[in-house]
Regions:
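N-terminal leader/targeting segments and the immediate start of mature chains
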Residues: 2, 8-12, 16-59, 89-94, ...
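A generic structural signal for short, solvent-exposed coil/turn residues
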Residues: 4, 11-13, 21-22, 43, ...
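Generic detector of low-complexity/intrinsically disordered segments
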Residues: 4-14, 56, 111, 117, ...
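Short, solvent-exposed coil/turn segments at beta-strand boundaries
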Residues: 22-24, 51-60, 75-82, 146-148, ...
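Short, solvent-exposed secondary-structure boundary motifs
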Residues: 35-45, 60-69, 121-134, 143-145, ...
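An acidic-aromatic
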Residues: 52-120, 181-186
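Solvent-exposed helix/loop surface patches that form functional interfaces
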Residues: 99-140, 145, 202-213
C-alpha cells in the first residue's frame, strides 16, 4: 500500500499555498502515462493512469494492476472523504480531511512546495487555463513525429521550466515536460482527454466490496 499512500499525498489537498483553484464545472476524464526518458515503457510506472475530476472537491485516480507486487490502486476523493484502495486484495483506508479548505488537487509536476508558485498551479484538468494565464503565446511550432505539428508553450521560473505541447486545432493537450537546471525531470504524455462529460456520482462514492480500516483524519493544515 506504500505507493498508494504516496500517490494519495500527490492528489489530496496539499499543505503548500495555492494561488489558483482548478474546479471543472463538468466532469473531466484524462488518461496519461509517464514518458520520462529512461523509464522502461513496459514497466508498471509507464502504464496508463486514469483521472476523473469534477468541481473543486471530487476526484478519482485509477491505476493499472501491478501483479508482481499484488497492487491494483484506486483513490476516490469526495471531500472531506477519501478512500485509498487496493483492488487486488479488496482492502482500503478511509481518510477524513479536517479542513479548513476542502479542495481536491491533482498537480502535474512533482516537487510540491519546492516548486515556484506558478508551477504549483499546473493541474490535470486545467492545463489550458494555466497556459492562458502564464504562457498564452506559443514559443514555436514543433514536429512531434510523423508530421504531427504542435504548439509549444513554455514558462520558466528560476531553475524550473515547463513546456506544454498543445494540438493547434482543437487545443488538446499532447504532453507536459518539466525541466530543472536544464535537465528533464518528468514527461507526461496524454493518451485521452475528455471534457464536458455528464457527472457520474458513482465514480466519487465509497467503493463497494472493500474491507476498510477505521477512518483516519488527516492532520489539519
Amino acid at each position: 500500500m506504500l505507493r498508494l499512500i504516496i500517490m494519495a499525498l500527490l492528489v489530496l489537498p496539499a499543505s503548500v499555498a495555492w494561488a489558483a483553484e482548478c474546479a471543472p464545472e463538468k466532469m473531466v476524464r484524462i488518461v496519461t502515462r509517464d514518458a520520462t526518458p529512461g523509464i522502461d515503457p513496459q514497466s508498471f510506472p509507464a502504464l496508463p493512469k486514469t483521472l476523473y475530476r469534477l468541481g473543486n472537491g471530487r476526484g478519482r485516480v485509477e491505476e493499472m494492476p501491478d501483479a508482481s507486487r499484488g497492487v491494483h490502486g484506486l483513490i476516490v476523493v469526495n471531500e472531506p472523504d477519501a478512500w485509498i484502495v487496493n483492488l487486488h486484495d479488496r482492502s482500503g483506508r478511509h481518510v477524513v480531511d479536517p479542513g479548513p479548505g476542502l479542495i481536491f488537487r491533482a498537480p502535474i509536476l512533482d516537487g510540491g512546495g519546492e516548486l515556484p508558485a506558478p508551477l504549483r498551479e499546473l493541474e490535470f484538468g486545467c492545463e489550458l487555463a494555466f497556459v492562458q494565464a502564464y504562457a498564452p503565446k506559443s514559443d514555436e511550432r514543433v514536429d512531434a513525429g510523423g508530421g504531427l505539428m504542435l504548439d509549444k508553450h513554455q514558462l520558466s521560473r528560476g531553475d524550473h521550466r515547463v513546456a506544454i505541447l498543445v494540438h493547434p486545432k482543437d487545443r488538446g493537450i499532447y504532453a507536459v515536460a518539466h525541466y530543472k537546471a536544464g535537465k528533464i525531470v518528468r514527461v507526461v504524455r496524454y493518451v485521452e482527454y475528455q471534457q464536458g462529460l455528464a457527472p457520474d456520482a458513482r465514480l466519487f462514492s465509497r467503493p463497494d466490496g472493500i474491507q476498510f480500516a477505521a477512518p483516519r483524519p488527516r492532520a489539519s493544515r
